[in-house]
Amino acid sequence: MNSSSLLTPSSSPSPHLQSPATFDHDDFLHHIFSSTPWPSSVLDDTPPPTSDCAPVTGFHHHDADSRNQITMIPLSHNHPNDALFNGFSTGSLPFHLPQGSGGQTQTQSQATASATTGGATAQPQTKPKVRARRGQATDPHSIAERLRRERIAERMKSLQELVPNGNKTDKASMLDEIIDYVKFLQLQVKVLSMSRLGGAASASSQISEDAGGSHENTSSSGEAKMTEHQVAKLMEEDMGSAMQYLQGKGLCLMPISLATTISTATCPSRSPFVKDTGVPLSPNLSTTIVANGNGSSLVTVKDAPSVSKP
Amino acid sequence: MEFSRDAGMMMENKRNVCSLGESSIKRHKSDLSFSSKERKDKVGERISALQQIVSPYGKTDTASVLLDAMHYIEFLHEQVKVLSAPYLQTVPDATQEELEQYSLRNRGLCLVPMENTVGVAQSNGADIWAPVKTPLSPAFSVTSQSPFR
């Protein structure tokens, strides 16, 4: 009844006053009704509305509404106080958030400051390095050292051209190749020199070979023939290339006369070297041909091809 | 308080990063010095070895050793050319085949593995040629061969 009586006076003054304003007020009242603390306030305020309803004038009604609001607020001190505290607490969060953001900005500023300080520390470190690297020193000691390095580099390049496997870039490996090649060349020269020393014995070697003419000629492998062909061709063109080729193959150039002498010297005593003696048998025949050629007799030269043909 | 603590942590992290950078730089420098020292020692040893082969009584600085090596290699090439010339000159013109023209055996030369050649080069040439001069008497040759071996 009380609630219905309250509703009716609100509806009655609406035609008297402006309808939209009253509608807005009604909406506001509805929102207030929807809030939780309102029912408790309604229960507490049950006797005052009846006394207010006695004067039916609109003006009084407005005053009554305002009075109700004013009275409601102090009556519900606890609830509005809680609401206010809640509002402050909720408000404090955004207040703290900007404080937090302020802190972040401070940390960022500190980060930038430290970055700038780091940059400042880095700059003096890089500056002397740049100077040391880029600057062309002009003192005589530095110039002399530079010339020495350039001279060594030029000579190292020249040696690379003379040495097989000259494509290595490591200085230590390059020197190893040079050392091995020099040793190989020394060995080659010594072997050829030994044959020169034995030149006087060519006649005796011919005699021994004539006695050994009955030996069968063993055919060498095609690969060996190709290697010999390549070496002979290179020796005609460039001795340096031929020597590099031989070192790469692990072979050494030796006169057949020297090889024959070595095989005959070792043949009678050591049987394990029979296999080795078998290898230079074919050189015997070629040596015979060459010996005939060395005889400087045209007739013998003609005989040599006839012998080789069959 | 929480934000101030976070700021402190950030500062500590940055300091750690800086220290790591410094340690890495130090390691890099130490590696360079170590490797450069090793390289210098290796190169120095090889230069000494090359000098012993090329010019035992010559100058010892790197540039001089390299120059002597160049000259010595060219000299050895010339030596091989001169020593092999007698064999190369005896080219049989009668044969027209290119393969035979470039064959070593027609010229009195053959290829021997370096392993078998080292022993020959180390020995005295006279010992090898001596037995050939006395093939007439087998008994004498046998007796003569025994003292050489």
UniProtKB/Swiss-Prot annotation, chain A:
Name of the protein this chain belongs to: Transcription factor LRL2
Keyword list, A-Z: DNA-binding, Nucleus, Transcription, Transcription regulation
Pfam families, sorted: HLH (PF00010)
Biased composition (Low complexity): 1-20, 104-126
Subcellular location: Nucleus
PROSITE patterns: BHLH
UniProt-annotated stretches for the region Disordered: 1-23, 95-143, 203-225
Recorded superkingdom: Eukaryota
Main location as per UniProt: nucleus
Record function comment: Transcription factor that regulates the development of root hairs. Transcription factor that regulates the development of sperm cells.
Keyword Nucleotide-binding found: no
Source species taxonomy: Eukaryota, Viridiplantae, Streptophyta, Embryophyta, Tracheophyta
InterPro entries: bHLH_dom, HLH_DNA-bd_sf, IND-like
From Swiss-Prot, chain B:
Keyword Nucleus: yes
Record GO cellular component, one term: nucleus
Transmembrane segments: none
Keyword terms, alphabetized: DNA-binding, Nucleus, Transcription, Transcription regulation
Lineage of source species: Eukaryota, Viridiplantae, Streptophyta, Embryophyta, Tracheophyta
Residues forming coiled coils: none
Main location: nucleus
Annotated source species: Arabidopsis thaliana
Gene from which this protein is expressed: BHLH153
Name of the protein in its database record: Transcription factor bHLH153
Record keyword Transcription present: yes
Compartments, as annotated in UniProt: Nucleus
Gene3D superfamilies: Helix-loop-helix DNA-binding domain
Family statement: Belongs to the bHLH protein family.
GO molecular function, one term: DNA-binding transcription factor activity
bHLH domain mapped to chain residues: 27-76
Matches recorded under InterPro entries: bHLH95_bHLH (IPR045239), bHLH_dom (IPR011598), HLH_DNA-bd_sf (IPR036638), IND-like (IPR045843)
Matching PANTHER family: TRANSCRIPTION FACTOR BHLH153, TRANSCRIPTION FACTOR BHLH83-RELATED
Superkingdom, taxonomy of origin: Eukaryota
